[in-house]
Amino acid sequence: MKNQEESGWQAFLTLCSKMQKEKFLQDLFSLFLSFGERKDVASRYHIIRALLEGELTQREIAEKYGVSIAQITRGSNALKGSDPQFKEFLQKEI
C-alpha cells in the first residue's frame, strides 16, 4: 500500500508541475482537496511564512492566525528538517 501512496503522490506532484495557469491549479486543488484540507494548507502556509520571517513568537502566530501551538510546532519541526537551500528559496519566495 505504501508504494501505491508514494506513486500516487509522485503522480499528483507531476500533474501539479504541469499546471501553467493559476486557474487550472486552483481547479485541480479544488478537485483533489476538500474545503477543510485547503484551509489547513492555507494555515500551514501562514505558519511557515511567519516562522521564516522570525518576527513573531509562537503564541503571537497562534493568536494572529487562529492556529494551535501544536500546529506551529509541527511546522517548525518540518522547517528544521528541510534542506538549507530549500529554506533559502522559501525565504525569497514567501
Curated annotation (Swiss-Prot):
Spell out the GO cellular component terms annotated for this protein, sorted alphabetically and separated by semicolons: cytoplasm
Question: Where is the DNA-binding region?
Answer: 58-81
- Coiled coil: which residue ranges? none
Q: What Gene3D superfamilies has UniProt attached to this entry?
A: TrpR-like
**GO terms, molecular function:** DNA-binding transcription factor activity; sequence-specific DNA binding
Predominant cellular place of this UniProt entry's protein: cytoplasm
Gene Ontology biological process terms in this record: negative regulation of DNA-templated transcription
Q: Which keywords are on file for this protein?
A: Cytoplasm, DNA-binding, Repressor, Transcription, Transcription regulation
Give the location in the cell: Cytoplasm
Question: What's one Pfam family here?
Answer: Trp_repressor
Q: Which InterPro entries match?
A: Trp_repress (IPR000831), Trp_repress_bac (IPR013335), Trp_repressor/repl_initiator (IPR010921), TrpR-like_sf (IPR038116)
NCBIfam families linked: TrpR (TIGR01321)
Q: Which PANTHER family match?
A: TRP OPERON REPRESSOR
User: What family is it from?
Assistant: Belongs to the TrpR family.
The subunit field of the Swiss-Prot or TrEMBL record says: Homodimer.
Function, please?
Answer: This protein is an aporepressor. When complexed with L-tryptophan it binds the operator region of the trp operon and prevents the initiation of transcription.
Q: What protein name does the entry list?
A: Trp operon repressor homolog
Q: Which organism is it from?
A: Chlamydia trachomatis serovar L2 (strain ATCC VR-902B / DSM 19102 / 434/Bu)
Gene label? trpR
